[in-house]
Structures are given as C-alpha cells and as structure tokens.
Amino acid sequence: MEYKIGKEARCAVIGYGSWATAIVGLLAANEARVGWYVRNPEVLEGLLGEGRNPRYLSDVEFDRRRIAPSDDLDEVVREADIVILATPSAYLKTFLEPLTVSLQDKFVVSAIKGIVPGDYKTIVEYVHDRYDLSYKQIGIITGPSHAEEVSRGKLSYLTVVCTDPENAQMLGEKFATDYIHLSYSTDLYGIEYAAILKNIYALSVGIAVGLGYGDNFLAVLIANSAGEMRRFLEESYPAERDTLVSGYLGDLLVTCYSVYSRNRRLGLLIGHGCTVKSALNEMTMVAEGYFAADCIRHINARHKI
C-alpha cells in the first residue's frame, strides 16, 4: 500500500514524555493539527483542559486548536499518515499493544533512542519485523538535541534519516522552524545504533564524574567512546559514513556533557554510591542507556564483535 509523507500528510505522536512533548511542539508550529496518543489520564486531562503536559515540560503551553490528544490509539493512528514513535524503548510494546489499525499505509518515524528489551532489536528493526513494513517507509528523527532546549526555542540541530533522500527532505519540512536546523542521512542503521550507544557512554561518563574523575579523564573516555562507536558500526554494518558529524559525534557529546542528560544523571547517582535500583527509582525519566547496555552485549555476541 502507498504511504503519504508530503506537505499534506497528517502527523501523530505516540508518547507523552519530554521528547514527545517537544516534538509535538515543533509539529504544531507547522501543522494545522497534530494527533497525540496519551494514555496517562493526568497528562491527557492537562492537555485537554489547559494545553499543558503537567508531568513533562509543564512550562510549555500548546495552542489547543493545533493538538488532538486522545487515549484512543486506533483513532489517533487511523487519522494520521505519519506516525512518530516517542516512547521509552522498554515500553514501546505496551504502548502499541492496543493497536488494531494497520500501519501498511503509514510512514513510521522512530524518535526513540533505544533497543526493544528481550527482542534485542532496534526500533526500526522491530517495526520492520513486527508490522511487516519496508525500510523505505520507516524513518528516524534524532539529535544532537535535548527536549528541554528544543521546547524553549534554543537553536538546535536535528538529524532526519530515511533510506530515500526525498523522503528525508519531505519529513524534515515537518520539523523545520527558525530555531531548528536539519541535517539529513540515509544511514538508518548507523544513526540508530549511534544514538543507542551514546546513551551507554553517557552513563559511564556520569559514573566517572560521580567517582571524582576530572575533565582530563573525561576527554579520554569520550574520545575512546567515539572510536569504539565507529568500530562497532564498521564491524556490524560496513558502509561509507562520517561518524564525526552531528548525527553521530554531536549526539554523543551533548549526551555525555549536558546537564539535561538523563543517562549521565543515572551514572552520576551510581558513581556517588547509589545502588542501581535506588538510582533508577530516583530518576523521574527513563535512562535508555540502562536498558541498552545488556542488549548491546547480546548484539555484540551475535555479530561476534
């Protein structure tokens, strides 16, 4: 079946966290109305009543005429041409569990930087296999960026990834604003794995900071992380790619250094002496690096890396 991705294509976002909220804000600046699947009753009530997400980025106020929050997943997906997944990777299956509407005529975009636990598949791989979609109708939107700065109109760069460059350009138009600049890539595999690996590296940086290591050591740790990322991609999926550009290295740097980095924050708590369990309980947002670490170990074994 044919999918629609051009100017007239309608967008919907699945998820209600900080990144999902920031993405809806970008889309609402360009689109007449954005579908939004919100399964949390408190968040849904806040969006419908006040145009605010009371749990994440609560200072962001939406024009309620431009958003269509709903707890009916089928309705949201049915009315959309482009479906953007913006849930934590560990909860993607449960978010999509109620779905009975076919995705065959949809263009699906992953804004998730993680691996589906237990399946040991990236989001793109999982969507491809589970919903029988071609890789041509799956895209990625990634950083380097944090939701907090995007939502406040800070100059940011996003990377749009599709196997078809024309699709990437059309998808990018949905997100472009005067403060959002876009770069494009066809490296679906490389960009997605780079976004996964950088969360693990940021966790290690947080641990190092928590243990009292300084900038000298962090420079070595992050530089070697960048090298390991490049080698992983070369071994697992050889292709011509420049891992020094923003979609790879830039995303790694912002996640390792930013005060907004939840993965760095989790590592910091562990470095300060918290148990992993207590550190996770203290986090108000999901740190993807925690789930990704074990998944990458299995993937390394699969590829014999």
Predicted features and spans:
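NAD(P)+-binding Rossmann beta1-loop-alpha1 motif at the extreme N-terminus of oxidoreductases
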Residues: 1-60, 66-71
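NAD(P)-dependent Rossmann-like dehydrogenase/reductase catalytic/cofactor-binding core
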Residues: 7, 198, 205-209, 234-305
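Conserved active-site and cofactor/substrate-binding residues in soluble primary-metabolism enzymes
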Residues: 14, 18, 22, 42, ...
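Rossmann-like NAD(P)(H) cofactor-binding subdomain of soluble oxidoreductases
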Residues: 63, 70-78, 82-155, 171
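Internal alpha-helical scaffold of NAD(P)-dependent oxidoreductase catalytic cores
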Residues: 91, 102, 130-134, 155-242
